[in-house]
Amino acid sequence: MPVRMYDVSPRVFCAMQNLDITLLASYPEAEIRPVLPSLVRMSLLSPLDNTESSMESRKEILAVLIGIEVVNSIVSYLQVNYHELENELKKELQARQKSAFFEGQQHEYGLQSGIALGFERADVARKVRVVLSEIFNLQQQVSEQKPAAHSEMLDDGIYLEEVVDILCIALAELPSLLNILELTDALVHVPNGHRIICALVANFPDCYRDVVSHVIANCDEDGSDGKHRLMLLMGLSEMNPSQALANRSMCVDMLKVPSFMLKLTLKHPEDLIAFLTGLLLGNDQNLRSWFAAYIRSSQKRKGDALNLVRVELLQKVIQTTTNAAELRDFNLQGAVLLRLYCALRGIGGLKFNDDEINALSQLVTSCPQATPSGVRFVTLALCMLIACPSLVSTIPLENKAVEWLQWLIREDAFFCKRPGTSTSLGEMLLLLAIHFHSNQISAISEMVCSTLAMKIPIRPNSTNRIKQLFTQDLFTEQVVALHAVRVPVTPNLNGTILCYLPVHCIQQLLKSRTFLKHKVPIKSWIFKQICSSVRPVHPVMPALVEVFVNTLIIPNPTGKVNIDHMHRPFTEAEILHVFRTSKLTFFAEELPPMAESQELNQIEVTCPLTAQLLMIYYLMLYEDTRLMNLSALGGRKQKEYSNNFLGGLPLKYLLQKAHHYHNDYLSLFHPLLRLIISNYPHLSMVDDWLEEHNLAQGNSTVVVSKHELKPETLDRALAAIQTKPHLAIRVFKQLLQMPPETQAQYGQQLVKHLPMVFAKSVPRYVKDLYNDIWLRLNAVLPTTLWIMSLRAITNGSDTMDRRTFANESLLEPMEVLSCPRFVFCSPYLLMILLRILKGSLAASKTYLNVHMQMQQKQVLDKNGMMQTDAIWEDLRTTLIASQESAAVHILLEVLDYIASKATDRVSHLELREIQGIIGTYVHQAFISEPSLAKLVHFQTYPKSVIPMMVASVPSMHICIDFVHEFLNVTEMEKQIFTIDLTSHLVLNYSIPKSLGVSKFCLNVIQTTLSMLTASTKCRFLRNVMPAMVRFVETFPILADDCVNILMTTGRILHSQSSLGMTTMEMPLTDSDKLCTYRDAQLHIIMIEDAFKALVTAVMKKSDLY
């Protein structure tokens, strides 16, 4: 009578894996019974090699099998003709596929007395056939997704041993029909299927990993067969416990069977916390989402695996809390548990039960030692109180939390900053209190998530209890303000410090106007923090400066606090304290000395560049905010920084440094650049940026000279520059190798000799070197350099006070052009002058915008007329346009003057160079403001300059679009100028549109000639005749129109010469007749000459025909 099959033990499976026959021989017969099929088959098969070791192994297997009665029946299964059986089974499978009723006719498989009794009485071959047919029937039901029918052989445990024996041998003998993975999919649906599969895997241990991965990949816990597959996986894991972690890894990789994964983890409880932490806080977002979804769904159906995990975690929390005094790494273990429970709650949505809440409350309110790890534990515990509101859901729990927080405040070791650390718990408590007072739950959520290093949702309504604790019981608003200002500034504050700092607290308090409300001064603290900042700049520092400036100027939106009683801007002495180490501050002139207080002298500037950039950002933002809120000030006097003071600070140099260290000043460079472009456009001109880039490319390496350049040496070289230029060349090259900070020290000496350097007798190479030095100085502190350059050019330092682009002197661009005539005749001086002129016009435009805004607001305050906007806008536009057009006209008149004085070859070369310089300036002016071109040409300029303008200004082609409008003007001079301009334009731009404009000009000429008197007609024709020739030269098709104009004009002049100037003036005397005849001859000669010129122009274009 068959007996029930024993499950495969782990040691038997291990011995089968290693084929350790000695161990198998030492195990009881019942224990090795499931693996006998493989052992019997190995003993009967002929070995592949006949080595001595192979023979010994075979003897050992036979020794194990001797005396086991069931071996004989297994041997009989091996004697079946499997080749013939395979053919029969194939036919059966084909018949199953063809007939839908096959399974109904094969229930008994040819057995007369039923399957169970017939199976016992059948011969060996029939038994094998019955078992395999039963398997095929089961596979067919599974493939058709039908519920598995009852099977006497597979459901009853008394036949399992024989079924396993047959299947093990059939798997080896019939590989084309049977596959262990397919068998697994079929057998998993029967009650004893997991035991059969485990026995099969034990006989084929090399298939273990394939079977496990196959079952995991196809397992759905919510499916109908999920429970059976879980039983199979647990059976396989118990059979081979050494692979438990490997199986768990497969679950994680495939994102399958989380219950099995957790049960495997519980077999290694020491690894539980680390494993769960990795799932929820790892870098794999898909894994985190998958496990979080499992936690939520498992809570609904009360999954046993999750409950077991919660029980184990709860025991660990209780054990850790109970043994806190004895554990050396309590802080570390507690911090890990806190983060894990926060992740389970925030990411997985786990709802704590009462036991977990009490245990976690006990853990959170622990009082560790004041060590760095203790501070870390307490910080995480504080964040967990906020992230898990259930920890303060009852009055006892709330009281316990309040006592713990009060203990934190009393403990200076926790509340105050510890040596060697960048933050303190007190700063974090302050910042939380600030956020709670201002009801900024999103900022609290961001802070908690950042501290816990996880993204968890914190809803506003869930924080009401903890908010009440902070704002009413612990930190009132006044306590927060008074304590925050006494917190020391963060030394060496930089962007790599990611924790929450005092600067965060101050920034939030300033933003909420708490300091103003409770009359707490804060300027000194902010100044110290600016001086203690280093690069890379902390991202909150620009925000701190911005909110400080807003507090100084912008009124409180609620209107409850008068802002004029407390905060004060930085004084000039404080600002100069930051710039005291700079070699570039006021290198042209010194301001009156300012006394520094003893407290100010004790403040050390850690990183001068960072502090100076922050202070410049403050100044730019302060001025911009003040000007934008003039109406909001309501007549209240607000501090203004003098223009001379602002002009002496190296704004442009610092902006370049911020651009050079762009990554270190990422949060500061862009807003600073925006402010400078808006308020100081002369410091951010395109030409300067391109010039500085080219200089940086050409001199990428700065060589520090071993020998310092003495001022006496520089003066001596500059004084003898005309007689001994080699001295100047050597000195200038040495200067070019110096960094800009060092060059600036010699700026006053260099600029003082500016006219002497650019004298005609000085070699051009020396001028080029000096020009490079001037451009380098211009890149450092341009406003001061421009002032000194203008003084040197005008040779009247007494008549020109110190001027910057924020006051009236240099705001008038015409004063820049009021220079001696030799300046315009020197190409180098002219380039310097035009660079200053561009900056002057840019600054003047900004000043007029601000001035218009101020005046406009004042007018609106008086009468509120809507027309005021347009009136002031028109005035501003008109004034700016008049300044720009006046500058262009002056330059064009200079060009006309120089052209009139050009007599020799050298002067013509200088004229050509100056023409290119002025043409480039005019071109840029026309491109930036196209309407300026229309205004300049409407006002006209010397006709002799027109050819040079067309040749040297590429943007002159835009005049073709509007030049026809000027021909409608009745003034003859403007018509002549327009026709002459048009002729040069069409000669240079022979495009279809030019042909239409040319025809229009000829029509105007013809119409005008028909309406003029004889003398006026001749004068007009004499002026437009060269233009007509250029029209014909460009478009020969216009020759007929020009000839027609000449012939008509000639007939009219001839007729009038015979009658007099008019029909009423008959020539009565001989002298009058002679005079009239002489004039007529001259007119006829002029027309003949014009006709010859036309013919010549047409002949030049003969190649077109």
UniProtKB/Swiss-Prot annotation:
Primary location class: nucleus
Pfam entry (one): INTS2
Function: Component of the integrator complex, a multiprotein complex that terminates RNA polymerase II (Pol II) transcription in the promoter-proximal region of genes. The integrator complex provides a quality checkpoint during transcription elongation by driving premature transcription termination of transcripts that are unfavorably configured for transcriptional elongation: the complex terminates transcription by (1) catalyzing dephosphorylation of the C-terminal domain (CTD) of Pol II subunit Polr2A/Rbp1 and Spt5, and (2) degrading the exiting nascent RNA transcript via endonuclease activity.
Taxonomic classification: Eukaryota, Metazoa, Ecdysozoa, Arthropoda, Hexapoda
Subunit record text: Belongs to the multiprotein complex Integrator, at least composed of IntS1, IntS2, IntS3, IntS4, omd/IntS5, IntS6, defl/IntS7, IntS8, IntS9, IntS10, IntS11, IntS12, asun/IntS13, IntS14 and IntS15. The core complex associates with protein phosphatase 2A subunits mts/PP2A and Pp2A-29B, to form the Integrator-PP2A (INTAC) complex.
InterPro entries found in the cross-reference section: Int2_metazoa (IPR026236), INTS2 (IPR029321)
GO biological process: positive regulation of gene expression; positive regulation of neuron differentiation; RNA polymerase II transcription initiation surveillance; snRNA 3'-end processing; snRNA processing
Organism: Drosophila melanogaster
Protein's UniProt name: Integrator complex subunit 2
Family: Belongs to the Integrator subunit 2 family.
Subcellular location: Nucleus membrane; Nucleus
GO cellular component entries: cytoplasm; INTAC complex; integrator complex; nuclear membrane; nucleus
Membrane topology: Single-pass membrane protein
Keywords: Membrane, Nucleus, Transmembrane, Transmembrane helix
Membrane-spanning segments: 822-842
